[in-house]
From Swiss-Prot:
Physiological role: Required for rescue of stalled ribosomes mediated by trans-translation. Binds to transfer-messenger RNA (tmRNA), required for stable association of tmRNA with ribosomes. tmRNA and SmpB together mimic tRNA shape, replacing the anticodon stem-loop with SmpB. tmRNA is encoded by the ssrA gene; the 2 termini fold to resemble tRNA(Ala) and it encodes a 'tag peptide', a short internal open reading frame. During trans-translation Ala-aminoacylated tmRNA acts like a tRNA, entering the A-site of stalled ribosomes, displacing the stalled mRNA.
PANTHER family referenced in this protein's UniProt entry, alphabetically: SSRA-BINDING PROTEIN, TMRNA-BINDING COMPONENT OF TRANS-TRANSLATION TAGGING COMPLEX
Gene: smpB
Single Gene Ontology MF annotation: RNA binding
Stated family: Belongs to the SmpB family.
The protein, known as: SsrA-binding protein
SUPFAM superfamilies, sorted: Small protein B (SmpB) (SSF74982)
Organism, scientific name: Stenotrophomonas maltophilia (strain R551-3)
Cellular component terms (Gene Ontology): cytosol
Primary location class: cytoplasm
Family annotation (PROSITE patterns): SSRP (PS01317)
Subcellular location: Cytoplasm
Gene Ontology BP term (one): trans-translation
Amino acid sequence: MSKNSVKDKAKSATANKTIALNKRARHEYHIEERFEAGLALQGWEVKSIRAGRGNIIDAYAYVKQGEIFLIGAQITPLIQASTHVVANDRRERKLLLHRSEIDKLVGKVERDGYTIVPTAMYWSKNKIKLEVALAKGKQTHDKRDAAKDRDWAIEKQRVMRRGNRDA
């Protein structure tokens, strides 16, 4: 086995770890802090996620009786899923976090007007993990400013490339 094939395998292994991304979260929220949380899933949900049927774009988390639950995440059941289990693709799922992390999130959400938003779903040691972020909503003008900054960064790169070609 050559060195290149080992590098290619490593790259493909890291690329396969991401199940779903929530790009909308970065656009609509100021992300303050990120946490890694486990998910309490049923067997058919894990099978569906392995088949690439997970979606977290419209999802958010909320606090209920000192625990944090994910709602709005869609895990579409497989066609060959078992019929004796009623598959609800948008059911609320419990997030598994340490008590200190839960307390920190609860304090910020209840007092400071933050929200808990999932940003990514990925594999970690054969377990499905969810990256949740403590975030504050952006105003419309904040979104426009972010778009301007992004456009300016792209334009700067173009100018720099043109300048390097001429030299």
